[in-house]
Amino acid sequence: MSTSSSDPFFNFAKSSFRSAAAQKASASSLPPLPGPDKKVPGMDIKYDVVIVGSGPIGCTYARELVGAGYKVAMFDIGEIDSGLKIGAHKKNTVEYQKNIDKFVNVIQGQLMSVSVPVNTLVVDTLSPTSWQASTFFVRNGSNPEQDPLRNLSGQAVTRVVGGMSTHWTCATPRFDREQRPLLVKDDADADDAEWDRLYTKAESYFQTGTDQFKESIRHNLVLNKLAEEYKGQRDFQQIPLAATRRSPTFVEWSSANTVFDLQNRPNTDAPEERFNLFPAVACERVVRNALNSEIESLHIHDLISGDRFEIKADVYVLTAGAVHNTQLLVNSGFGQLGRPNPTNPPELLPSLGSYITEQSLVFCQTVMSTELIDSVKSDMTIRGTPGELTYSVTYTPGASTNKHPDWWNEKVKNHMMQHQEDPLPIPFEDPEPQVTTLFQPSHPWHTQIHRDAFSYGAVQQSIDSRLIVDWRFFGRTEPKEENKLWFSDKITDAYNMPQPTFDFRFPAGRTSKEAEDMMTDMCVMSAKIGGFLPGSLPQFMEPGLVLHLGGTHRMGFDEKEDNCCVNTDSRVFGFKNLFLGGCGNIPTAYGANPTLTAMSLAIKSCEYIKQNFTPSPFTSEAQ
């Protein structure tokens, strides 16, 4: 928004109107919500760029385009609930970093299931005077069109400003050649170079590193043991993490806010930038022109006031996630509304919602072995009994016979002396393990050997969590046309949009075999660290629980030949000014976390926008 008094946005900023969400929010400098019935007389509400969605991908577009001088509006269906830093990671509190299991409840509270088959359980013990249904209920996300045998039952979305980045694991590995989509045809070296350039920039936005846990005893216990057991066969390292260690006991986890500060602009820190965030606003459809060559406007709905508005822009970017991008497009006349009909394919984006992928997931938890725990104090000289005056723990710094570095031994010595009541030699605030062996052709799955909070996997209070190691292995899924995400022409979701429905099964053949091999690999590897935790034996988890849904609006070079929706600049085929961002663009079978790859594609998309669209003039008169 301009700071010039001659700019109509300046006058509008001085008006008293705010969206209902903005009126009740405690965050400062929330924006006005433009609309034809609320605007200052004579003003024309138009942005250079509108972005739907405020997660890391939307924030990548915002960072690139706001910094390049574009006037940008961002709309999100969720509200601001992450504290002073809008869109920040909710794990960035001392409370959760001291007890990671408490964060499980935060994640569970944020996730909303996408498609839930109707519960056919009949309650036949109601009082005869109570109203009783003759059919099954359809509220709370229940979807009578969902086949429970072909569902992604664990698939869920997060509707808050910042999206899933407010509670994600921050794992940001790069895809290797086998997982990546091509950006450069017929030149593998040039494609490698292009991906390296984009990945490097994306990693800088996320502050990705591989050494935040280098002085964790538990991390090194697991890492060194696995490296020893698989010497010459597999490589182990820290999981690449979007995070910054602020102190030995506190990590700042990256989020959408790390990529782009979601405060409105201009402000004192960015006096020459133009950006507005509109929370609690549902984007319902984009309006196509008569030639189906560009988008003319975006229809939005203030979820608190109930008002509806039409927003105009030069460029429209949808980054609302793999499900909601597709939902918005279908509601706008792209793809096909209703159950797919192979004999009557849609004219616009016939591959929309087809060839979807989701990773298989195996999970278990182990309790570290006696051998590993005893090795923690192997350099200590222990005299006496804990609790007695004669008790002492010492070591010889720098001794060539030491098995551990001095920082390790100093922590162990101090803990054993200061907490003689504790049977474990591991300090209470020792950081968790964050280990991986990356996806490779001989073992085509991604691994996370760590201790973190998910919507599952909390540890009971009777087990000390310092002993626990979580094992999560993620398998790739081949894209198949029959695996689909489609949207009902009869039923709506809680936001009055077409109800999403899955038609999905893990394909037979390579996908299924690799999933079974992955399970075997996890069982063998985890047994080298310790025994299984009762209740967390090796198991396949619900389809969709990974929350890495991909391929819903696939990327490719040719719409028909590649069965895709967007080109390698993330621009929708046939449309000059409509762009899609997120994991829905990724058309390949991948096992690793896809966020960094989706961000890299967004950076490339922004480069195209900057080359082909000119920002509106900006004046710098004093406000």
Curated annotation (Swiss-Prot):
Organism, as annotated: Peniophora sp. (strain SG) (White-rot fungus)
In this UniProt entry, the residues modified to Tele-8alpha-FAD histidine are 167
Q: Which residues bind substrate?
A: 448, 450
Q: What is this protein called?
A: Pyranose 2-oxidase
Concerning PANTHER family, the annotation shows: PYRANOSE 2-OXIDASE
- MF annotations from Gene Ontology: flavin adenine dinucleotide binding; pyranose oxidase activity
Free-text comment on the cofactor: Binds 1 FAD covalently per subunit.
State the NCBIfam families in the record.
pyranose_ox
Name the coenzymes or cofactors required: FAD
Q: What class of enzyme is it?
A: oxidoreductase
Q: Does the keyword Cell inner membrane apply?
A: no
Please provide the record's keywords in A-Z order.
FAD, Flavoprotein, Oxidoreductase, Periplasm, Signal
**Per its UniProt record, what Gene3D superfamilies does this chain match?**
3.30.1920.50, FAD/NAD(P)-binding domain
Q: Show the propeptide residue ranges.
A: 29-38
